[in-house]
Amino acid sequence: FHTYFVGECGVLVHNDCKSVEGGVGYDTFDDAKKALGSPGEDKAWHHIVEQNQIKKSGLSSQDIHNTKNLVSIDSGYSGSVHSKISGYYSSKQSFTNGQTVRSWLAGQDFDTQFEFGKKVLEQYGTLTPTKTGWIFNQFV
């Protein structure tokens, strides 16, 4: 998908179009995992926009459990990218007005949460879109 913003001059500006083509959505995370298969050893399927936002933000399960929103990242051990991201989303930051990042995101639209989630992931590695999903390469 493409993202846009309106600048201070009131001009619509194309911001980004780095995305996975098409994407396949599933009703449940289990259905998505069955279709995608194993994320790899010491890895987990990570939702760029968190699963809890189905309830917190009223987002569709087809958008959340979608190949556009899932990426395989290191997980299962202390200090993994997955544990660092989970910790960050549970933390309170200066911009969250006393809320956790997770709560602060609640109610924001999918595209806003998606761009935020990508930026969080990109602190730990590079995200490359393919025709079938994202590839995450962790910084060494």
Regions found by a protein language model. Give the residues of each.
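Catalytic toxin/effector domains delivered as secreted proteins or via bacterial secretion systems
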Residues: 17-140
